[in-house]
Structure formats: C-alpha cells, structure tokens
C-alpha cells in the first residue's frame, strides 16, 4: 500500500479522526494537553474494534487489519498510533486470555474508549528473551472461605514492584497488564491491574522529548491485592510466546505508517529534489511493500510463534527503513523543513528516532539474534 493510499484510507473511512490528527499531530507530540482525548477519538472512529470478533463487540477482520489501522494512524500522528498500539495490544491480550470472565468484564469499556488499556509487558518481553528479571513480585495470601465447602478457596495475592515506562496510562482510567513473579515459585503470571486498585500509584508523565500526549508514565504497586479473576494467564512464558507476534506486529504498524508518510512527503519537494531521490524512493517503496506483506502474512499464519527470529529481523529491517525514509524526507524538504510550523519534518525526525529504542530495542534484538547464532554454531544447527 502506498503512503498516499494509506492516508486516503483513513481519510475515507474515518474523516473526522484524520482531520483531528492532522490538526493536532504537533500538539500530541509536544505536550499533554490533548492526552485524554486520544483514546476516545480512536474509539469514535471504530479503530479499537478492528480485528475483534463481532460476537465480542468488534467489527471483525483479522490482526492484519488491526496492523493496517495502526499504520494508517501513524501516517498522521505517531503519538496517536503509539496509543492505539497500547490499547489494541491490551485488547489482544484479553482475546488470547483463557480468562473469559476478565474479558467479559473489561472488553466493553476498552472497545468504546471509556477505559484505557496499557500493555505493560515490555519487562515481560525482555524476561522472555532473558534480558532482565521480572520487576513485580506476588505473595500468596489465599485464605479458605468461611463456608469450608469444596471449591471455597479463592486464590489471591499481594503484589509489590513497579514498571518504569508504560504508555496509555490515561488519567481518566486505565488497566495495565503486568508480568508477576510468584514468591512461592512456579511460572510467572500476567495480571490486569486497575488504576484504582489499592496501592497502585501512577507517576507524573515522563519528561519525554516527544510523544508527550501519550500518557506515558511509571507505575508502582505497593501491597496491591489481586485475585484470580484479575489474572490474564497463569503461565506467562508459554502465553507470551503465542502473543508476542501480535505485540510486535501491531508495534511494527507504527513503522509502516511513518515510512509511508515520509516517502509521500518526498513528493512535496521541488522537481529537482524529487528527481534526485526518485530511484531511492522507488527502492524504499518496494522494500516497504515486501516487508509489509511478510509481516502481515507471518502474524496471520502464526509463523512467528515458532520462528521469532524472523520477526526480530523484520522489526530491525523496518527500523532501518524508517531511518532511510526520514532522511530522504529531510533531503527533499531542504531548509523549509528546518523552519517551525511549515511542515511535520522535525516531528517525524523525532518519531523516527524513537523507533530503534521502543522495546524490544534494536540493540536488544541484535544481541538476541547474535546469542542465538552463537548457540547454533556450538550445536551445529546453523541454517
């Protein structure tokens, strides 16, 4: 899909959202004035329901359609796409959770934009790749019900710890997914932690250089009580392997949209500038089409569950493509792009700078791939 087609797609199916994003993209990046409005705007456009089964309140479609939605939004505002990624990824967690009661309780408010969903699993994804330990610990405080009747045990815990960086912690109300290590042993769990649960503290917004309208903050839990009906999964490692392709696939949608917008912006330069970079633009456009197809196909078919390295390589390639496309936009824009208020070039440079560091960062992925290759060399299983 070309950049222009992507933008026209959002303009055609969600004109009010497209206009709002175009009018406020700079504000969403530079301050928190409109941070409370992003999720409701996305919900009003129906984007939170894309790829969600109709019987669960969605509009149907696939996870590939949800990736396209993130890309479409990113072409207008990377900050809004970052929020959409967080919200839609949390929704995906519920769709893939065995806890139907939790899904029934939270999904309606998430789909209509009343409640914000924060993924909170960057730490868990690093844990899955043996990069860092889990940062939240649960103590079992289960007690036998007074009835003493079979089935009267109600599992419950108190959790302590924190996460230094979570997006979409909307002040009007949020629920965050967090991986928790059990003091008693056994596989870690993933819980849905509500903003108003006892002991939950949201910090002030982090002092970011961009994406300041994304409600990004730290979250701390002190003796926060959780019950079985708050648990997304009781086996985080096995569940994360299955959900990671959607987590990363939706995240990669942000890169797709940013590349499309930067490439489209090269057409806004003068004839001489366009001619000078025409071959480069054509090459990057072909790369974008190929990577988009591979990404969506791999996520849809479940290929990345068993071969996560392929997805890691795609994520790295897309980050490199973001850099190359943003550089071309600067070249064709010339001095005009360095003047305030005349274009979105400077904002997209900041957005492009964020892509390599969002978890999992390129450094983490490259180290993971290097470790895997070293292990393959030792075992003679290099492919």
Which residues fall in each region the model found?
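Glycine-rich flavin
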Residues: 34-44, 48-160
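C-terminal helix-coil-helix/basic helical segment that borders enzyme active sites and/or dimer interfaces
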Residues: 22-30, 271, 289-323, 327-340
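A generic local secondary-structure boundary/capping motif
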Residues: 105-108, 125-128, 135-137, 163-167, ...
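A generic N-terminal leader/anchor concept
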Residues: 1-60
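Glycine-rich phosphate/cofactor-binding loops in nucleotide/flavin-utilizing enzymes
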Residues: 336-383
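A short core secondary-structure module
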Residues: 162-200
């Amino acid at each position: 899909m070309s950049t222009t087609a992507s933008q026209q797609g959002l303009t055609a199916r969600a004109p009010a959202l497209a206009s709002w994003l175009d009018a406020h993209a700079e504000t969403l990046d530079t301050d928190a004035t409109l941070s409370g409005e992003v999720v409701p705007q996305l919900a009003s456009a129906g984007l939170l329901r894309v790829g969600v089964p109709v019987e669960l309140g969605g509009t149907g479609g696939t996870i590939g359609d949800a990736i396209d939605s993130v890309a479409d939004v990113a072409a207008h505002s990377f900050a809004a796409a970052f929020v959409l990624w967080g919200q839609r990824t949390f929704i995906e967690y519920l769709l893939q959770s065995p806890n139907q009661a939790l899904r029934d309780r939270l999904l309606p408010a998430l789909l209509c934009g009343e409640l914000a969903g924060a993924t909170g699993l960057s730490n868990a994804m690093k844990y899955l790749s043996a990069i860092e330990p889990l940062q939240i610990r649960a103590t079992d405080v289960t007690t036998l019900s007074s009835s003493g009747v079979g089935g009267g045990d109600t599992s419950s815990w108190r959790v302590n710890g924190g996460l230094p960086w979570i997006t979409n912690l909307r002040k009007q109300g949020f629920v965050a997914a967090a991986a928790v290590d059990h003091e008693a042993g056994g596989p870690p769990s993933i819980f849905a932690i509500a903003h108003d649960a006892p002991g939950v503290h949201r910090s002030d917004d982090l002092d970011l250089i961009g994406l300041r309208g994304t409600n990004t903050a730290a979250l701390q839990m002190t003796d926060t009580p959780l019950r079985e009906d708050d648990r997304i999964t009781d086996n985080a490692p096995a569940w994360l392997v299955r959900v990671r392709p959607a987590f990363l696939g939706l995240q990669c949608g942000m890169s797709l949209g940013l590349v499309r917008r930067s490439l489209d912006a090269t057409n806004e330069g003068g004839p001489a500038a366009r001619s000078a970079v025409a071959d480069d633009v054509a090459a990057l456009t072909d790369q974008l089409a190929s990577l988009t197809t591979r990404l969506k196909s791999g996520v849809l078919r479940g290929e990345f569950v068993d071969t996560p390295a392929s997805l890691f390589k795609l994520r790295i390639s897309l980050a490199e493509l973001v850099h190359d496309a943003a550089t071309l936009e600067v070249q064709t824009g010339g001095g005009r792009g360095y003047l305030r208020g005349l274009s979105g070039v400077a904002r997209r440079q900041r957005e492009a700078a964020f892509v390599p560091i969002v978890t999992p960062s390129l450094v983490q992925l490259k180290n993971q791939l290097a470790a895997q290759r070293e292990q393959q060399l030792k075992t003679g299983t290099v492919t």
